[in-house]
Amino acid sequence: MLDGRIMGLDVGDKTIGVAVSDLMGLTAQGVKTIKRVGKKKDIEELKAIIKEKQVNKIVSGLPKNMNGTLGPQGEKVIKFCELVKAETGIDVEFWDERLSTVAAERSLLEADVSRQKRKKVIDMLAAVIILQGYLDFKINS
C-alpha cells in the first residue's frame, strides 16, 4: 500500500487531463480536465487536487516523436512539470505518452460517445491511460 496516491497528468496547450491512483496503486481513475488559463492558476488547481486526494507523486505523460526524440511539445511539458515540482515539492516522473490520446479517442468512439462529450473527457481519459500504464509497469517490475 502507498502512503498516498499517484497523480497522472496529460498536459496540453489548452487543457490538462488529471487522473489519480487508488491507495493501493493498482488502478487509475479520471478526476477532471482542467481548462488552462495560466500557469499560476493551473498549478493552483492541481495543488487543490493534490491536497484533496493526498497525492505524493506525479506522473506526467511525455509526448515524444515516433522516433523517440523530444519535440517542442515535450519540452513545454517538462518546463511546466518543473514548475509543478517547484510549487508543490512533489517529484514528477515522466511516462512515454505516445498514442495515449489515440487510445483514448478509440475507446470513446467504441463506446459511441458523442463528439461533444469526447472533447470534454478525452484528456482526462488520456491521463488515466498514462497513469494506468505506469502503475501496470510498476506492479510487473
Swiss-Prot record:
It comes from the Bacteria. GO terms for biological process: rRNA 5'-end processing. The keyword Lipid biosynthesis does not apply. Its EC number is 3.1.-.-. InterPro entries: RNaseH-like_sf, YqgF, YqgF/RNaseH-like_dom, YqgF/RNaseH-like_dom_sf. Coiled coil: none annotated. It is found in: Cytoplasm. One of its GO terms (cellular component) is cytosol. Keywords: Cytoplasm, Hydrolase, Nuclease, Ribosome biogenesis. The keyword Hydrolase applies. Disulfide bonds: none annotated. GO terms for molecular function: nuclease activity. It holds the Pfam family RuvX. It is an enzyme of class 3 (hydrolase). NCBIfam families: RNAse_H_YqgF. Could be a nuclease involved in processing of the 5'-end of pre-16S rRNA. Belongs to the YqgF nuclease family. This is Putative pre-16S rRNA nuclease.
